[in-house]
């Protein structure tokens, strides 16, 4: 992770390579540099799919008869009235469904797909654990449709590939659409491993690359594992998350197994890595893993899930001594749901999570920004709330992540076992092509895709009020200059938005193509309801 570069309005902090010079001198003197990050992955915007719940592109890999007395396909969760409110079985989504809709994803301005883990999971529903509810974890009769219950980290789950579309072919197919693939990895746990009425095949077991079993929890509670066995084996003898097996990260056997499995998939075309439940494993483990991967892939980008709204807690992972791993910006997620959801809190509430200058994060410009995901309730907002959230997400600092279906407001407000992870399907994709949320998302995401200032530039906040916000994104190195004036209005009425312009230039508004000379100093523009304006200047500048 690259160290953040700081800037303050009216002066250069450490981003400037020399004292500020007047624009006319740029031809003969080195111009000041303004770089939020030089991380290549910062160019990306990420579309996140629970692969099984996106689109069924190949019904032949559904295995609808799998599981025997604990079937795995289509297991609805029923309310007290008998209505299906969610599903905890496989629903058919696969690699073919993603490839079939790769153009749909790319059109929205995304350049990467993050899919849930691809590794083999058990072939039955889990018979232990607590009954399904909104608490965590409640896993009784749930299946591994989500991919996080790995039993063989070197084998694809059979529900994902198709003939001629194994993982290497899948990543190559995405490449043709300009889409990277983010590999979701787990280092904390395997599958549910105890509390079953009787032992079930694969649960609590680990298999090697050759298909042979190398570890088995034997349906024992962790405290039944001896200290000697825990020290030399695969599993700790204390629980962590529900009934999931708790990997012994201090064991060289575990480290070697996991590291080599991650490299196995990277060798087949995965482009970046998302780390699940990072806070459940000590930092030294992830330093070993990231060092091991970067020995072969020195530019590999990692980001991790540490579910906490405390910036200092999640920032630890971004430090070089802990692996230099970016994180999903959970403090930002909480703020965005509050501001753009039905609570409709003021835009000024967004400022606190940015941490542009206080040094909490190694580099705040490399954080993954999002407003909801598969583990929490989807954002409960009107269409305008989603539009405004995307306008902010794709112009402010960080790398945007959007959860599948959000482009149509899919299952808004619903939690994990209340519809959050429902099957989307080809019919919904086709129906939503011209949805107003999606059309507005395309507009602003394509602007970011073309703008180095929005991708990598420093952010200088100007005016944030109840319904409006204005700020500057600035990027300049020895060969490229781009200054972006960003203005947002989340009100249902037109609003005048003010901004202090740092540089006189002939600006071009990125969404409309309108051109205007804007002089340095105070300036305001009247914005339509629920809208954004991004004025771009490509001449050299000094702030």
Per-range role (PLM):
Residues 111, 271, 400:
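Short acidic/polar active-site loop segments enriched in Thr and Asp
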Residues 25-27:
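Boundary at the C-terminal end of the N-terminal hydrophobic targeting segment
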Residues 49, 105, 115, 153, ...:
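Conserved, mostly hydrophobic/aromatic
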Residues 45, 518-543:
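C-terminal beta-strand-rich structural cap/linker in extracellular carbohydrate-active enzymes
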Residues 29-30, 171-173, 178, 189, ...:
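Active-site-proximal helices and loops of the catalytic beta/alpha 8
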Residues 13-23:
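Bacterial N-terminal signal peptides
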Residues 3-14:
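Bacterial N-terminal signal peptides that target proteins for export
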Residues 32, 38-44, 52-268, 288-297, ...:
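Substrate-binding/active-site clefts of carbohydrate-active enzymes
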């Amino acid at each position: 992770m690259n160290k953040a570069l700081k800037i303050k309005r009216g002066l250069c902090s450490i981003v400037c390579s020399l004292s500020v010079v007047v624009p006319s001198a740029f031809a003969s003197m080195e111009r000041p540099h303004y770089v939020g990050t030089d991380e290549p992955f910062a160019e990306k915007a990420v579309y996140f799919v629970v692969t099984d719940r996106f689109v069924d592109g190949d019904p032949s890999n559904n295995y609808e008869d799998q599981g025997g007395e604990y079937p795995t396909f289509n297991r609805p969760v029923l309310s007290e009235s008998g209505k299906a409110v969610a599903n905890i079985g496989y629903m058919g989504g696969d690699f073919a469904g993603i490839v079939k809709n790769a153009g749909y994803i790319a059109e929205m301005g995304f350049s990467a797909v993050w899919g849930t883990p691809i590794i083999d999971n058990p072939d039955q529903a889990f018979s232990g654990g607590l009954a399904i509810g909104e608490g965590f974890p409640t896993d009784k009769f749930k299946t591994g449709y989500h991919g996080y219950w790995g039993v063989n980290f070197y084998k694809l789950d059979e529900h994902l590939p198709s003939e001629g579309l194994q993982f290497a072919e899948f990543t190559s197919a995405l490449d043709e659409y300009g889409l990277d693939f983010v590999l979701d990895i787990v280092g904390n746990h395997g599958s549910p491993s105890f509390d079953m009425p009787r032992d079930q095949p694969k649960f609590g077991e680990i298999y090697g690359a050759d298909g042979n079993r190398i570890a088995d929890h034997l349906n024992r509670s962790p405290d039944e594992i001896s200290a000697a066995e825990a020290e030399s084996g695969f599993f700790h003898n204390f629980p962590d998350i529900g009934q999931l097996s708790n990997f012994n990260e201090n064991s060289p056997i575990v480290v070697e197994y996991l590291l080599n499995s991650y490299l196995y998939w990277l060798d087949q075309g995965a482009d970046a890595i998302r780390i699940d439940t990072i806070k459940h494993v000590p930092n030294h483990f992830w330093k070993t893993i990231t060092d091991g991967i970067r020995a072969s892939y020195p530019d590999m980008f990692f980001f991790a899930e540490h579910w906490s709204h405390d910036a200092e807690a999640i920032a630890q992972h971004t430090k070089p001594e802990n692996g230099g791993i970016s994180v999903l910006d959970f403090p930002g997620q909480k703020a965005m749901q509050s501001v753009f959801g039905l609570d409709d809190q003021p835009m000024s509430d967004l400022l606190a999570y940015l941490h542009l200058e206080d040094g909490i994060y190694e580099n705040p410009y490399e954080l993954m920004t999002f407003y909801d995901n598969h583990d929490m309730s989807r954002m409960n907002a009107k269409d305008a709330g989603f539009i405004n959230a995307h306008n902010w997400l794709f112009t402010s600092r960080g790398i945007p992540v959007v959860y599948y279906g959000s482009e149509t407001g899919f299952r808004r407000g619903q939690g994990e076992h209340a519809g959050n992870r429902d099957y989307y399907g080809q019919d919904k994709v086709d129906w939503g092509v011209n949805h107003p949320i999606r059309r507005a998302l395309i507009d602003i995401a394509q602007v970011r895709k073309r703008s180095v200032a929005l991708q990598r530039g420093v952010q200088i906040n100007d005016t944030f009020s109840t319904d409006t916000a204005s700020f500057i994104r600035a990027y300049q190195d020895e060969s490229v200059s781009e200054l972006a004036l960003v203005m947002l209005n989340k009100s249902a009425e037109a609003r005048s938005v003010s901004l202090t312009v740092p540089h006189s230039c002939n600006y071009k508004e990125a969404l409309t193509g309108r051109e205007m000379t804007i002089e340095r100093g105070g300036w305001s523009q009247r914005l339509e309801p629920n809208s954004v304006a991004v004025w771009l200047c490509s001449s050299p500048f000094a702030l």
